Amino acid sequence: MKFIIEREQLLKPLQQVSGPLGGRPTLPILGNLLLKVTENTLSLTGTDLEMEMMARVSLSQSHEIGATTVPARKFFDIWRGLPEGAEISVELDGDRLLVRSGRSRFSLSTLPASDFPNLDDWQSEVEFTLPQATLKRLIESTQFSMAHQDVRYYLNGMLFETENTELRTVATDGHRLAVCAMDIGQSLPGHSVIVPRKGVIELMRLLDGSGESLLQLQIGSNNLRAHVGDFIFTSKLVDGRFPDYRRVLPKNPTKTVIAGCDILKQAFSRAAILSNEKFRGVRINLTNGQLKITANNPEQEEAEEIVDVQYQGEEMEIGFNVSYLLDVLNTLKCEEVKLLLTDAVSSVQVENVASAAAAYVVMPMRL
């Protein structure tokens, strides 16, 4: 196996395929990248058995067909360390991989390509293309609500659901829920799968979200695959039942509050400074045309913020974890938000007034 290539052609692909590799691989070969030269193409693959990232790069200079695996971190560090514009030759010599460029020469250990684990073959059940920007928005709108190391393992991920012409993402950690749906202009079979947290983060790294560049998504019963430009990302799915988010959305909210997103965000941020550091609770009092936020902590310090809002109705008091509300307001980045409430013990639903694509539910707190 042999190829010659410019440093820049391989730098980004190396960075992306090294992404799935964890710090300390359980098997030595999982710390390696698979390098495979075929006719005019070099493919690079990294895997941690849960997900796999593959990049294809075209070879214009002389090359010899073959395959091997090489320590990912060291190979990438060498590549990154070589000067910009360098031409690099890579050659397999016995069980060593020789990397040469200018006056630099490296000899790396390898493991046989035949030992490299492949994700099992699988059939996709749903396939469609969509703009990268759409998928990026779907993930960005909901990923902050994913659970982290929850014993309910199915919450440590994101639900991807196809229905009619929409793709929907849902995430919840049991205290809050985020759901976002986008029309992708093609009729889809109803299907839902849970993509693990790490897979969602890797997929997000692949998306540049620029303009209308398209990607292809394939969803099977145990895997999800995304074809993005010269990259193919595959992730195993979480086997479990995701909670029915439709039951979490407040049924018939009786109170509607409309407020400026930025003004509300700043008021909550200031009040949060004097909230209990552990529980982060703030109290909200609603009266006609006004929303009052109060916070206090064990040191008996207090904060009070009053915000003008559009609200007509009976007075009401309710408590929330201020961090959860701020996460939602930071994600919405809109002009005006709508809060839908029922009573002091029911969840609040938060939406952008101008768009119903995303909805957020936050459970109340007893204060």
UniProtKB/Swiss-Prot annotation:
SUPFAM superfamilies listed in its UniProt record: DNA clamp (SSF55979)
Keyword Protease: no
Pfam families hit by this protein: DNA_pol3_beta, DNA_pol3_beta_2, DNA_pol3_beta_3
One Gene Ontology term of the molecular function aspect: DNA-directed DNA polymerase activity
Main location class: cytoplasm
CDD domains reported for this sequence: beta_clamp
Electron transport found in the keyword field: no
GO cellular component: cytoplasm; DNA polymerase III complex
GO biological process: DNA strand elongation involved in DNA replication
Domain of life of the native organism: Bacteria
Keywords attached to this entry: Cytoplasm, DNA replication, DNA-binding, DNA-directed DNA polymerase, Nucleotidyltransferase, Transferase
Compartments where found: Cytoplasm
Gene3D superfamilies, per the entry: DNA Polymerase III, subunit A, domain 2
Similarity annotation: Belongs to the beta sliding clamp family.
PANTHER family according to UniProt: BETA SLIDING CLAMP, DNA POLYMERASE III SUBUNIT BETA
Described purpose of this protein according to its UniProt entry: Confers DNA tethering and processivity to DNA polymerases and other proteins. Acts as a clamp, forming a ring around DNA (a reaction catalyzed by the clamp-loading complex) which diffuses in an ATP-independent manner freely and bidirectionally along dsDNA. Initially characterized for its ability to contact the catalytic subunit of DNA polymerase III (Pol III), a complex, multichain enzyme responsible for most of the replicative synthesis in bacteria; Pol III exhibits 3'-5' exonuclease proofreading activity.
Subunit organization: Forms a ring-shaped head-to-tail homodimer around DNA which binds and tethers DNA polymerases and other proteins to the DNA. The DNA replisome complex has a single clamp-loading complex (3 tau and 1 each of delta, delta', psi and chi subunits) which binds 3 Pol III cores (1 core on the leading strand and 2 on the lagging strand) each with a beta sliding clamp dimer. Additional proteins in the replisome are other copies of gamma, psi and chi, Ssb, DNA helicase and RNA primase.
Protein name as catalogued: Beta sliding clamp
Upper taxonomic lineage: Bacteria, Pseudomonadati, Pseudomonadota, Gammaproteobacteria, Enterobacterales
Gene responsible for this protein: dnaN
